[in-house]
């Protein structure tokens, strides 16, 4: 009976050692869980970004409205018959040395 109790205590000690100090111990487990959570958050942001890009690609393939909007915003395109006006705010006029 004493040998059985001694054997069980040794087994319990070995398991406790592996749990707290051995490979794949509890602290490593917690660290990996935080890394997984961070990676999942990063993946979520990338999935949202990819969805936006997919929608933009579909929009560009379907019609000319998205292409026209992009050309207007990025390239300054003006349609024939339209007049382009640039509105300069008051803060820009104050910084302009030629406007005294």
Curated annotation (Swiss-Prot):
Q: Which residues form a coiled coil?
A: 49-73
> Which residues face the membrane's Cytoplasmic side?
1-3
Q: Where is this protein found? A: Cell inner membrane
Give me the segments passing through the membrane: 4-21
What keywords are annotated for this sequence in UniProt? Cell cycle, Cell division, Cell inner membrane, Cell membrane, Coiled coil, Membrane, Transmembrane, Transmembrane helix
User: In what way does this protein cross or attach to the membrane?
Assistant: Single-pass type II membrane protein
> Taxonomically, which superkingdom?
Bacteria
Q: Name one Pfam family in it.
A: DivIC
**Ranges in the topological domain labelled Periplasmic:** 22-100
Q: Name one GO biological process term.
A: FtsZ-dependent cytokinesis
Extract the PANTHER family matched here.
Answer: CELL DIVISION PROTEIN FTSB
Listed under subunit, the entry gives: Part of a complex composed of FtsB, FtsL and FtsQ.
* Family according to the record: Belongs to the FtsB family.
Describe its function.
Essential cell division protein. May link together the upstream cell division proteins, which are predominantly cytoplasmic, with the downstream cell division proteins, which are predominantly periplasmic.
Descriptive protein name: Cell division protein FtsB
